[in-house]
Amino acid sequence: MFEKTRDMDVRCNIEENGRISKPKDNKEIRESQSKMPSTYPAPGSSEGCAKNKSSSAVDPEYCRRILVRDAKGSLREIILPKGLDLDRPKRTRTSFTAEQLYRLEMEFQRCQYVVGRERTELARQLNLSETQVKVWFQNRRTKQKKDQGKDSELRSVVSETAATCSVLRLLEQGRLLSPPGLPGLMPPCTTGTLRAPNSSGPGTTSLPTVTNTHPHQPGLHPSPTGHNIFNMPVPSLLGTVANRLSSHPLTMAGNLQELSARYLSSSAFEPYSRSISKDSLDKKLLD
């Protein structure tokens, strides 16, 4: 039994090997030889390069060549995609009528964002497209933001200028607290009394005090000659004190002195006067 099966297996293998190793017909061999090229060009030969150049010279369908003159005047060839339509005319700018602008401005004041049915209805009433209405509102919002930025800068400049002008006006009118030795800055008094100094101790003197009975009027002119800056004649007993007051620019009282020092020490008053410390004033009084 085993020998018969072995003989059958050997026969099958021989038949299969014969089928595989069977040569092709002469016709098939000739056809395959005719299809194969007889010679192959070398990789670096001129024929291969010429074929590659000829194939690359043909531009693809999505590209086109144009001649452009550069800054030096020489012509250059540029390859651009055909999708870039350079010959297309520019879109004409939309010109709105006065009625359309008035209606659009009124709607913008009411609501800065018009969308949906409101925009459709507004475009229909004004005989415009929704795109035109949308673009107009976008440009109007951009313009408003720019105007607000300019207004804020202008307000800051105007406020600084107004503050400077008010300070200069007050300095000219003499309403600011200033030393009495500076007649241009001291307000003239209509009526007042000059009180004699009270001696608090030996070797110490106190400054005279002034009491005004009427409020200051800015329209009054300075006092005539023969009167002091307080618009009252100086008594004979206080002649030396008046000379000291005219020679030393001192304030009338301690509170006024502190206030004037605060005012004069600020940056707005630096170009017009200099602040004097308490120590220097006390030294001048003792001298």
Curated annotation (Swiss-Prot):
Residues 89-148 bind DNA. Transmembrane segments: none annotated. Residues 1-55 are annotated as: Disordered. Residues 1-33 have a biased composition (Basic and acidic residues). Keywords: Developmental protein, DNA-binding, Homeobox, Nucleus, Transcription, Transcription regulation. GO terms for cellular component: nucleus. GO terms for molecular function: DNA-binding transcription factor activity, RNA polymerase II-specific; RNA polymerase II cis-regulatory region sequence-specific DNA binding. SUPFAM superfamilies: Homeodomain-like (SSF46689). The keyword Metal-binding does not apply. Its main location: nucleus. It is found in: Nucleus. InterPro entries: EMX-VAX-Noto_Homeobox_TFs (IPR050877), HD (IPR001356), HD_metazoa (IPR020479), Homeobox_CS (IPR017970), Homeodomain-like_sf (IPR009057), HTH_motif (IPR000047). CDD domains: homeodomain. SMART domains: HOX (SM00389). GO terms for biological process: brain development; central nervous system development; neuron differentiation; regulation of transcription by RNA polymerase II. Involved in ventral eye development. Belongs to the EMX homeobox family. This is Ventral anterior homeobox 1b. The gene is vax1-b.
